Structures are given as structure tokens and as C-alpha cells.
Amino acid sequence: MKVRASVRKICSKCQLIWRGKRLSVVCVNPRHKQKQG
């Protein structure tokens, strides 16, 4: 899980999801998991 100021899709399978007030990226590849912090 990477915590970044700006999250973005890395590949075509990445999905941007709002979790409460946090924007996060969920993907098949676990290395692509990100959350905004």
C-alpha cells in the first residue's frame, strides 16, 4: 500500500474507489494499491 498525495491508475486494471473521504486505487496487482493521504 502506497500513501501518496496524488493517486493515479498505473495499469488498465486499476480502479479508483472513494472510501469515505479517501480516494484509493484497487488493482489485481497488489503493488498498485494506493491511498491518498
From Swiss-Prot:
Where does it reside?
Plastid, Chloroplast
One GO molecular-function annotation for this sequence? structural constituent of ribosome
The cross-references to PROSITE patterns, in alphabetical order and at most eight, read: RIBOSOMAL_L36
Annotated TM spans: none
Q: Name one Pfam family in it.
A: Ribosomal_L36
Please tell me one Gene Ontology term that the record gives under cellular component.
chloroplast
Keywords carried by this UniProt record = Chloroplast, Plastid, Ribonucleoprotein, Ribosomal protein
Q: Which GO terms describe its biological process?
A: translation
Q: What is its main location?
A: plastid
Cross-referenced NCBIfam families: rpmJ_bact
UniProt lists the family membership as follows: Belongs to the bacterial ribosomal protein bL36 family.
This protein is called Large ribosomal subunit protein bL36c
Q: What is the lineage of its organism?
A: Eukaryota, Viridiplantae, Streptophyta, Embryophyta, Tracheophyta
Q: By which gene is this protein encoded?
A: rpl36
